[in-house]
């Protein structure tokens, strides 16, 4: 995988991809615009608090690596930045609108289930149903120039597996939960419920005894 983004680089690129689609009238972004986007409290996981100098350093590095380019033409006294990460004129990475929406949401929020991705990516692309989300994820996971996402083992107690992007390197994938561990969890839950019932019965008997003594 030739893409190796740090967490801050992934946040910067994710923000530019997002704003290119959701607020095209404000795109490309100035340094201040990128700082604000990176530090948003909504649709970000984790929430970051990057300084202007930290963001500027990421922008400079990404420009050198040809993932971004500066825009400072006539009438633009402030340098602005636009992404060349995907779908640029001379770039190799070509993604559909659906793929851009999923990749952007993964860059901004980390590992997520298909259901979470569908709802969170809705401002960028309206998926017709869950089948379209899952088929797009599978395409990203099996592309010849990829893979760009990976399906993680399902977590205990969760109905859906999560997916994660691979633009920051390989993802540590925990082993799938075995039936034995599920059985152990079920046994523990049953024991806890039995103890709760026993405590409730003891409390009821104590209340009854205290009421009797009061008489």
From Swiss-Prot:
Does tRNA processing show up as a keyword for this record?
no
- Give the source's domain of life in one word: Bacteria
Instruction: Supply the SUPFAM superfamilies for this chain.
Output: Winged helix' DNA-binding domain
Q: Does the keyword Magnesium apply?
A: no
In this chain, where does the modification N6-acetyllysine occur?
Answer: 80
Task: Keywords in alphabetical order, please.
Answer: Acetylation
Q: Which family does it belong to?
A: Belongs to the UPF0502 family.
Query: Can you say what this protein is called?
Result: UPF0502 protein YceH
Name of the encoding gene: yceH
């Amino acid at each position: 995988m030739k893409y190796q983004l740090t967490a801050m680089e992934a946040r910067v690129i994710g923000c530019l991809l997002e704003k290119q689609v959701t607020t095209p009238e404000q795109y490309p972004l100035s340094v201040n615009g990128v700082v604000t986007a990176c530090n948003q409290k909504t649709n970000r996981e984790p929430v970051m608090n990057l300084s202007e100098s930290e963001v500027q350093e990421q922008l400079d590095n990404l420009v050198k690596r040809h993932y971004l380019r500066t825009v400072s033409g006539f009438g633009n006294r402030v340098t602005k930045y636009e992404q060349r990460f995907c779908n640029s004129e001379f770039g190799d990475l070509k993604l559909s609108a659906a793929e851009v929406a999923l990749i952007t949401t993964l860059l901004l929020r980390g590992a997520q289930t298909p259901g979470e991705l569908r709802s969170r990516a809705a401002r960028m692309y309206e998926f017709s149903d869950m089948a379209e989300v899952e088929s797009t994820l599978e395409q990203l996971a099996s592309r010849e120039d990829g893979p760009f996402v990976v399906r993680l083992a399902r977590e205990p107690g969760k109905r859906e597996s999560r997916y994660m992007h691979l633009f920051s390197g390989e993802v540590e994938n925990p082993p799938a939960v075995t039936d034995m561990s599920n059985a152990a969890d079920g046994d523990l839950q049953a024991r806890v419920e039995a103890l709760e019932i026993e405590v409730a019965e003891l409390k009821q008997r104590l209340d009854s005894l205290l009421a009797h003594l009061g008489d």
